[in-house]
Amino acid sequence: MIGGIKLRIMYSILNILYTNKAQSKLYALTQKDIEEALIADGEKWCERTVYNKIRALVKQGYVKEGLKKSNSNTFYLTSEGIEWMKEVEGDIENE
C-alpha cells in the first residue's frame, strides 16, 4: 500500500504525462516540464521529491525514459501506468 501523499504526487505526475500525451520516447516530458505543470495545477514540490517519485515510477514500470531533450532526461507514461491510474481512480470512486 502506498501512503496518501506519496500516492497523490505519483498520480499527479502520471496524470500530467497523460494529459500532455507523453506516451512514447518521442513525446516525453522533462522533469522541469513536470514540475512546471505541477505548479500550474497548484502543487508545489521540491525538485528532489519530484525526482525521487519519477525514479520510483520508472522502477515500478509506470514511466519510462524517453529521448534526451538537450541534456535533460525525458519521461513518458507506459500502458502499465495508465492501468494503475485507472485502478487508483476506481478506488477513489468506491470510497
Regions found by a protein language model. Give the residues of each.
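Short acidic, hydrophobic short linear motifs in intrinsically disordered regions
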Residues: S24-L38
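A short, conserved structural fragment
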Residues: V58-K68
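Minor-groove-contacting beta-hairpin "wing" of winged helix-turn-helix DNA-binding domains
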Residues: S70-L77
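Short alpha-helical segments that sit at the start of domains
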Residues: M1-L26
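Short, amphipathic alpha-helical interaction segments positioned at domain boundaries
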Residues: S79-E95
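Short amphipathic alpha-helical interaction segments
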Residues: K44-K59
